[in-house]
Amino acid sequence: MNLTFDPYDLNEMRAYFRTWYEETGREDFRFMATAGKEGTPPAQRNYKYIPAGIYVMRTGWGPEDSYFHVHGIQLERGEVSSHSHNDTGHVEIHAKGEDILTDSGRYIYNSSCWKDWRHYFLSAKAHNTLYVDDHEMGTVPGVTRTRGVRTYLHAFEENEQYQLIDISHNGYDFMDDPMFHRRRVVRLPDDVYVIEDRVTGICREEHDIRLYYNFAFGHLDGENGKFDYTSQKGRRYTMTVQADKKLDFEILEGSEDPIGGWISYGYAWRKPIPQLIAKHSGKAPIHFITVLAPAGTRAEAAINGDAATVTLAGGKVLTLTENAVELR
């Protein structure tokens, strides 16, 4: 471990950019250090950091721009494994300058007597991704401090019609009945987001299969796969979740039994947030399609055989098959 006193505030990301700007003179670092008040924005909008497993696409660097982030790290052993949450496939959405789907944070460490809370914030439940049987992603039976998670990036592309991040991972491969997760996130014009999940495997046993969505501060209600969310700025969104098998739904907010619907911005600090859970009890395979769109925007999803479709205003249709994404 190296003891360092730079940057000036280890808990503030902008301090790192400030130090980098002072060392390099780069105006994009100055832009980040001053939250856009000085300097110039980065020339590039979309970034893929494959070793770190961070994939980000955005519309721009202004205060009313949007971005989405998909997480897909490579894990094996040591501190990278020990400090990583069960969040492969996690997606965050920031629309028009505010968080919509968010990360729940860390809350507390194992040295605390609140180990059930530590387990929750580490788990897939506290992230916007697939949960299976409360299995810790990548763990191998009988092997400690090793998590064999591998993520494959299928596509990271932008064209005139959409932005796409497409990954798959083996986080549930080491269960007795192995399962695999592929997730595609598509951003369409007008901040329409499509999240497609394909869960496959040997499919011999029944499982507790869930999708979790943790919303930023706001209000969430609804039922039967259609939900209304009002953001902190009072903007209204609609989320629909469906699958090719039966789903049950639950909304938690500040729940202590079961633990669910919490966010932590600092150590031992937590506040309630809305959390949506889509549940299926049974065997894989299962195919999910989730659509998040501003209220009143036409975005009608359906699953027909291998294909998932989303019909948009004007009659355009987004089609996702196993090997292709098309909008026409």
Map each language-model feature to its residues.
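Short, surface-exposed beta-strand-loop junctions and turns on beta-sheet-rich folds
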Residues: 63, 76, 107-109, 173, ...
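Catalytic-core segments of enzymes that bind and process phosphorylated/nucleotide-bearing substrates
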Residues: 94-96, 107, 133
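CBM-like, beta-strand-rich accessory domains located in the C-terminal region of large
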Residues: 6-7, 14-17, 21-22, 112-114, ...
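Short, surface-exposed loop/helix-turn segments at secondary-structure junctions
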Residues: 71-75, 110-117
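Catalytic Cys-His active-site segments of thiol-dependent hydrolases/isopeptidases
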Residues: 101-106
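Carbohydrate-active enzyme catalytic cores, enriched for enzymes
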Residues: 1-100, 158, 282, 287, ...
